[in-house]
Curated annotation (Swiss-Prot):
Recorded superkingdom: Bacteria
Protein name per its UniProtKB record: Cell division protein FtsZ
UniProt subcellular location: Cytoplasm
Alphabetic keyword roster: Cell cycle, Cell division, Cytoplasm, GTP-binding, Nucleotide-binding, Septation
SMART domains linked to this entry: Tubulin, Tubulin_C
Major localization class: cytoplasm
MF (Gene Ontology): GTP binding; GTPase activity
Subunit structure: Homodimer. Polymerizes to form a dynamic ring structure in a strictly GTP-dependent manner. Interacts directly with several other division proteins.
Name of the gene this protein is made from: ftsZ
NCBIfam families documented for this protein: ftsZ (TIGR00065)
Length: 390
């Protein structure tokens, strides 16, 4: 039986993409067939809204000429303030609102905090998932992004920040245009991890109340996704998840985690326990954990482990991939793990995330590249020199 046949809506979840980057991310999610959510796009740019497949849209601002925010966050903020009645109407009835946007431009940076504040006032669990600019995009754009994140953090229950610079470290050899699709793919996976936990029936089930416990009033959060196959696959996938290329900082010290383990019918309870135990050891003894396990026959011998960690300090410094790997290696040296193969621990200590085990982005990118054949000339998240028709 497919996930779609199994799908049972249990909470009213709305995903709203704000600005050019947010609109693009929502389009990726729609085309990927994410189930159990209502999609909304919001923009000051009417052309961007007309290109979207989302069933619901909000044209921000009283000025309906629809010319965009000109990369000015104040314009985006004012436009959202002028559209409060419509925003409230579109978000009404939601149990959870997920806001996705690119920080640094005008609409996403300025309007997202206004929308998050409204969602929270309406009683919805409010989660913001945002991207930050590449360093080469300049000081002003990066400064705007940091100010936007500060404003968004103050009005969100949880915020997950995905750094384009971090993606550049990992996938810098990819064509430049594809770098933005990597970010969209990760945003899609982040939203899907959250919504699947709530909406897809599982053998070890989680629901909206579980997600609310972990994410309400928790501030900074992160997501890690790992995969592995063969002997000790659960342990390896868990280690890969906490060493994930998209993790901005160490998972150590998080107050709460959601762990979701996906495997085929041969997934065992011992493997589930092993994966959860690895992450509990990495985070620390004070962590509160909830976990679920889902069967998906399409992934064959692989196991996927997704972890969302919340309650991280906003002052915690960002770490490079090597710094995170070094920390995981050090932790592994003293961790007691039941393993099928004696060499597994040594292999993981030497390299917690081998290149061939990194999250499967490249294969997904081929599909998403076909999905997002769009006109980027109005996308306020793209650097000027990457836009078409200029």
């Amino acid at each position: 039986m497919s996930d779609l046949e199994n799908f049972v809506p249990t909470a009213n979840i709305k995903v709203i993409g704000v600005g050019g980057g947010g609109n693009n991310s929502v389009e990726t999610m729609i085309q990927a067939g994410i189930q159990g959510v209502e999609f909304i796009v919001a923009n000051t740019d009417i052309q961007a809204l007309q290109r979207s497949s989302a069933p619901n849209f909000i044209h921000l601002g009283e000025n309906k000429r629809g010319l965009g925010a000109g990369a000015n966050p104040e314009v985006g903020k004012k436009a959202a303030e002028e559209s409060i009645v419509e925003i409230k109407e579109k978000l009404k009835g939601a149990d959870m609102v997920i806001i996705t946007s690119g920080m640094g431009g005008g609409t996403g940076t300025g309007a997202s905090p206004i929308i998050a504040k409204i969602a929270r006032e309406l009683g919805a669990l409010t989660i913001s998932i945002v991207t930050t600019p590449f360093e080469f995009e300049g000081n002003l754009r990066n400064k705007n992004a940091q100010e936007g994140i500060k404003n968004l953090r103050a009005v969100s229950d949880s915020i997950i920040i995905i750094s384009n610079n971090k993606l550049l470290e990992q996938y810098g050899d990819a064509p430049m245009k594809d770098s933005f699709l990597f970010a969209d793919t990760i945003l899609k996976h982040t939203v899907k991890t959250i919504t699947d936990i709530i909406a897809i029936p599982a053998h070890i089930n989680l629901d909206f109340a579980d997600v609310k416990t972990v994410m309400k009033d928790k501030g900074d959060a992160l997501i890690g996704i790992g995969r592995a196959s063969g002997k000790d696959r659960a342990v390896k996938a868990a280690i890969h998840a906490i060493s994930s290329p998209i993790i901005e900082t160490s998972i150590q010290g998080a107050s709460h985690t959601i762990i979701n383990i996906t495997g085929s019918a041969n997934l065992t309870l011992t493997e589930v326990h092993s994966a959860v135990n690895v992450i509990k050891n990495a985070v620390g003894p004070e962590m509160n954990t909830i976990f679920g396990a889902t069967i998906n026959e399409s992934i064959g011998d692989e196991i996927y482990v997704s972890v969302i960690a919340t309650g991280l300090s906003s002052s915690k410094k960002f770490n490079s991939e090597q710094e995170i790997k070094d920390e995981v290696s050090s932790m592994l040296k003293t961790m007691e793990i039941d393993l099928q193969a004696s060499e597994t621990k040594t292999i993981l200590i030497n390299d917690p995330l081998p290149k061939d085990e990194k999250m499967v982005l490249t294969s997904l990118l081929d599909r998403d590249s076909k999905i997002l054949e769009k006109d980027d000339s109005q996308d306020d998240t793209l650097p000027f020199f990457l836009k078409r028709n200029v």
